[in-house]
Amino acid sequence: MSVRGRVAPSQTPSRIPGTVLAYLALTKPRVIELLLVTAIPAMLLAQRGTVNPLLIVNTLIGGMLAAGGANALNCVADADIDKVMKRTARRPLARAAVPTRNALVFGLVLTAGSFLWLWWTTNLLSGLLALATIAFYVFIYTLLLKRRTSQNVVWGGAAGCMPVMIGWSAVTGTIQWPALVMFAIIFFWTPPHTWALAMRYKDDYKAAGVPMLPAVATERQVTKQIVVYTWLTVLATLALALATGWLYAAVALVAGVWFLAMAHQLYAGVRAGEPVKPLRLFLQSNNYLAVVFCALAIDSAIGLPHLF
């Protein structure tokens, strides 16, 4: 037997984990965390108490398939700019760890799987919402808006709001006003969250030709917009208190004051010409959303009486 014949079998297993991890990276697992943080509380609020655990699991599986499919297709569409940006240069397609055709097929399979799974285990509305989310994220945000307008994340962020709609519809089979308010919370939260990160990597966006707001506007203009959307976020969280108990309302109020203070602090620092740390707001905005929706989950699971 030749040396090549003896070495090849031992090399094959070592390549498998890397390939699996590359496909997993296409789904952007960190982005999927938003699904877990928001969908479960939405389901609990819809029921105002306990929800069948199997329904939660099935909804999360369908949601993860949908998010993974959307993210994989996004990676295919953005492969050219991912190669240019330092922050994304290690993504699978940017470093040719996965063939583009395979990534496209992978994304389409996950997309079809999400629709079929949600239709089979929950209801048709949830499956259709998942399909609509993927289509919006890929065609409207990634292909149409992202490279054409500085308001890309404002409108494109609607895709990230859909887990609450899917979670609510999985329980009720309908869409009601609390689901729309939760949609608004995430919709308004997305711009300050994303722009804070983009302030840190604005040179990357400039190099890639992506007109993210921090890449085309002054820091003062950006932070002013961050403050505006932070206020809208907090007001939306307080509006949701009309459908919750006192625990959620109290946490939303305290967390909202804290989030607003951070946004205003960033704006004040820029106005004063001081060095600022926008990445801190980006990281803490994750904590803010998690705290608010965890409070919503607990409030709903306990079944506290409505404030109003």
From Swiss-Prot:
Disulfide bonds: none annotated. The chain crosses the membrane at residues 31-51, 53-73, 102-122, 124-144, 149-169, 170-190, 240-260, 288-308. It is a multi-pass membrane protein. Its main location: membrane. GO terms for biological process: heme O biosynthetic process. It is found in: Cell membrane. GO terms for cellular component: plasma membrane. InterPro entries: Protohaem_IX_farnesylTrfase (IPR006369), UbiA_prenyltransferase (IPR000537), UbiA_sf (IPR044878). It catalyses: heme b + (2E,6E)-farnesyl diphosphate + H2O = Fe(II)-heme o + diphosphate. Keywords: Cell membrane, Heme biosynthesis, Membrane, Transferase, Transmembrane, Transmembrane helix. One of its GO terms (molecular function) is protoheme IX farnesyltransferase activity. Its EC number is 2.5.1.141. Pathway: Porphyrin-containing compound metabolism; heme O biosynthesis; heme O from protoheme: step 1/1. It is an enzyme of class 2 (transferase). It holds the Pfam family UbiA. It comes from the Bacteria. Converts heme B (protoheme IX) to heme O by substitution of the vinyl group on carbon 2 of heme B porphyrin ring with a hydroxyethyl farnesyl side group. Belongs to the UbiA prenyltransferase family. Protoheme IX farnesyltransferase subfamily. Carbon 2 of the heme B porphyrin ring is defined according to the Fischer nomenclature. This is Protoheme IX farnesyltransferase. The lineage of its organism: Bacteria, Bacillati, Actinomycetota, Actinomycetes, Mycobacteriales.
